[in-house]
């Protein structure tokens, strides 16, 4: 189903608790990063990702620590909208490819799972595309790092490090908190291979990554 009109009203999010603000915000961040490096990326989705990423960087912490700051809520609402437009047209990647099975197997908030997985998937993808000589995707990860950190000369890995720090600051619970153990990893990996989101990942990932 597709709506004729979508009304995005940031004022409706002012009462959202900090923990839900954090996890939904991290989901929005993942939905901006994954389409930007997706195998199905395109210029129009690039543009909306470039609009949304710096807004998350500027506003998510504030929206969590000062929930009534309307300008932060406005920025996050726009970033979330941009992520929705991007994923609908360019797909996602391994973060959401893993998050779907994990959410189905355990009682875990989707945004929390995405936030925990995001930096590790970014690091794995960066290493994989570097090994494959995919300079364009590597350049895109470096651009993500610039958009998130505000620093002009940064490595692709700096974006993943920035996300990891953010997730820690927002006190997102680890996957173990929902009951997942190392023994469950093989089942998650097997199910993730059937996830449509995996088709958008910029490169195949080995099972042991």
Where are each of the predicted segments found?
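Short alpha-helical scaffolding segments that buttress acidic/His motifs in well-ordered protein cores
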Residues: 29-33, 76-84, 118-122, 163, ...
């Amino acid at each position: 189903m597709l709506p004729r009109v979508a009304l995005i009203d940031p004022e409706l999010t002012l009462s959202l608790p900090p923990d839900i603000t954090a996890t939904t915000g991290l989901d929005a961040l993942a939905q901006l990063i994954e389409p930007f490096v997706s195998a199905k990326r395109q210029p129009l989705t690039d543009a909306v990702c470039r609009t949304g990423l710096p807004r998350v960087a500027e506003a998510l912490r504030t929206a969590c620590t000062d929930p009534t700051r309307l300008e932060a809520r406005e920025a996050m609402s726009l970033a979330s909208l941009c992520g929705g437009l991007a994923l609908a047209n360019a797909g996602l990647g391994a973060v959401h490819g893993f998050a779907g099975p994990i959410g189905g197997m355990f009682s875990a908030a989707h945004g929390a799972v995405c936030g925990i997985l995001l930096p590790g998937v970014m690091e794995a993808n960066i290493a994989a595309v570097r090994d494959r000589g995919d300079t364009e995707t590597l350049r895109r990860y470096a651009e993500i790092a610039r958009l998130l950190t505000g620093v002009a000369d940064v490595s692709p890995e700096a974006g993943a490090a920035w996300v990891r720090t953010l997730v820690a600051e927002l006190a997102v619970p680890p996957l173990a908190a929902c009951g997942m153990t190392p023994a469950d990893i093989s089942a998650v990996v097997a199910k993730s291979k059937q996830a449509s989101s995996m088709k958008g990942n910029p490169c195949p990932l080995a099972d042991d990554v």
